[in-house]
Amino acid sequence: MLKSISLALALFGLGALPAAAQEYKIAVIGLLHSHVWSHLPEMAKGKTAKLVGIAETVPELVAEARRVAGDGVPIYSDYKKMLDEQKPDIVWSFVENNRHREIVEACAPRKIHVIFEKPLAASYKDALAIRDLANKYGIQVMCNYQMAWWPANFAAKKEVDAGSVGRVWRLRGIVGHGGPGSTGTGKYFFDWLTDPDKNGAGALMDFGCYNALWALWYLGQPESVYAEATHLRPETFPKVEDSSTLMLHWKNAEGVFEGSWDLPRSFQDLEVFGLTGSVYMTQQKVELRKRQASEVAMEPLPPERADPIAFMVDAIRGKKPIDGMTALDINVGVVEIIEAAKESVRTGRAVKLPLPK
């Protein structure tokens, strides 16, 4: 009798744990990217996935991680040892951009899914290699942007897709602030962010990737990229540009995007122009602008799309690809645009897309 009841429960799924109760494990590789400190406290709570390890070798960063995450989370100096001992389902990597490929080379054969902070890679060659590895081993690779979890981004896109401004012909974006901090734990971030090899560029990479992502999300791959870079504060940023402008061209559209470490306050603003109006977006609000401006309602995102770990876990659980702004393909395209922009800065000429692979 008991055997038949157990069989019935199994057949109807009543004896299994609900999907939400299935535990996923996440590990952190590297603490050199300052964004880690805004995510680590939530990871330590284990709401969506259990934090099973952190890998870092810099003593000051290790001490800060221990303070934030607690003594119960093991900290490793060898990230590959951590992967083999803890066997995480997901790795969130906060290393230099030029090490992203290395991390995927370690994680992909172990069937570990990966989250990176933007951009996907420091070079187009590495971005292509990351995609090839992800496809070969069947893992998810997600590229995290702060703005990917803003209701404003989705409200603006929904308004444009509904035809509220007519055919889109122009994008104008500005992203930036007064420059990266260089004190406390931030000094380690500053050191590699201002290194053209480790970052891939300066402000052009740091903020150009946001603008390139917007461009692709709204209009797809441009036909050409022209870029200019400015070195306004060589005493602070001796190796890289601290301000840049991208000019993207499509058959019947254009985009003008600014990214800078020299602004008096923080900006992450986009305006999408159509033939009958525009949509203006910041993190806090979205406006439909015609002769007069009207505020567009912003709906809360569903829980599985409200933060990076929840989104990754939902994709793994549902065996569905990461989509939208954090998807792998669109972020390969982002790095391609930045690569073209760097070539344009070097030559002073527009660069046609697609780039040779």
Predicted regions and their residues:
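Bacterial N-terminal signal peptides
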Residues: 6-16
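Rossmann-fold dehydrogenase core element
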Residues: 129-147, 167-169
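Predominantly a Rossmann-like dinucleotide-binding segment in NAD(P)-dependent oxidoreductases
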Residues: 34, 147-237, 348
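N-terminal Rossmann-like dinucleotide-binding module
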Residues: 20-69
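Contiguous beta-strand/loop segments that form the cofactor/metal-binding neighborhood of enzyme cores
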Residues: 212-285, 309-321, 340, 357
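C-terminal helix-rich "cap/oligomerization" subdomain common to oxidoreductases
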Residues: 90-92, 314-357
